[in-house]
Amino acid sequence: LNAALGALLLVSVGARSALAQHLPDLVTTDVLRVCSDPGNMPFSERKGGGFENKIAEIIADELKVKLRYYWLTQGPGFVRNTLGTGLCDLIIGTSGGDIIQPTNPYYRSAYTLVTRRGEFAGVTTLDDPKLKGKQIGLIAGTPPANRLGELGMINDTHSYTAYAFGPDRKFQTVAAEIIADLAAKKLDVAILWGPSAGWLAKQSGVEMDVTPLLKEPDRPPMAFRVSMGVRLNENDWKRSLNTALRKRKTDIEKVLRDFQVPLLEEEENKPLQSSNE
């Protein structure tokens, strides 16, 4: 293990680009080492099929380096045991935190209302009377759960734990389980983070509507900016990534749209027009 760790942390002292000359010693300069979950579709998977995998490929291409992953299942301690150990240098998608330094945001999205096609046509807010008494599935501790509590609808909700571990789990993620229960009519409605909801709904085998929650009060927030994450104080590395994100903005947006990620304008809760329009 020590030998492997040492190999991962080696940095060549040979001729490097300007990028390499200004990076902290902990960041490797010939390989983009990404911290990622091996089974968290549509975000990431070991086969490289997730949209964060595709975005990592774009960044590696822009930096002219190879791509390597350090795999760890998402859960408590993910950042500490990935970035914090020095075994990888970049988290592709994060909304920030005390022990992580975010790059500039590269997309903004929102929580969504997911229903079977046509069953709740016209419903765009959580206080809509049509939702009263309906069976609503969501992940415990998320902003929509707080909002439903404020509305006195908590008794109608089915709260799923945020993480599912163990060999007996039937679904790769909790969000996938919720969508499966919606498809099976165990739920009337699901409320999920948009970047996972769109793709999972499309994969469910049942036609579904995915409606971003754009008209809710500012608190609790339903829309969030997503950045990449690096270690604290790695400012040169962050600036290099910001440059790559800016240069490849159109490519990244295409990947997100291909995975049905609801994209919002930077400041307003309005759908983002395609850069190709």
Set out the residue ranges of the language-model regions.
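Bacterial N-terminal signal peptides
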Residues: 2-12
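Extracytoplasmic small-molecule ligand-binding "clamshell" domains
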Residues: 20-98, 168-172, 258-259
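Ligand-binding clefts/hinges and TM-proximal coupling segments of bilobed small-molecule sensing domains
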Residues: 22-24, 72, 143-166, 242-277
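Bilobed "Venus flytrap"/periplasmic-binding protein-like clamshell domains
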Residues: 33, 38-42, 46-61, 113-174, ...
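Periplasmic-binding protein-like
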Residues: 37-38, 108-120, 162-165, 202-245, ...
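Short amphipathic alpha-helical coupling segments at ligand-binding clamshell hinges
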Residues: 51, 55, 132, 232-251, ...
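Acidic, polar ligand-binding/catalytic clefts
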Residues: 57, 61, 66-130, 141-142, ...
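Alpha-to-beta junction loops
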Residues: 64-66, 83-93, 134-135, 177-178, ...
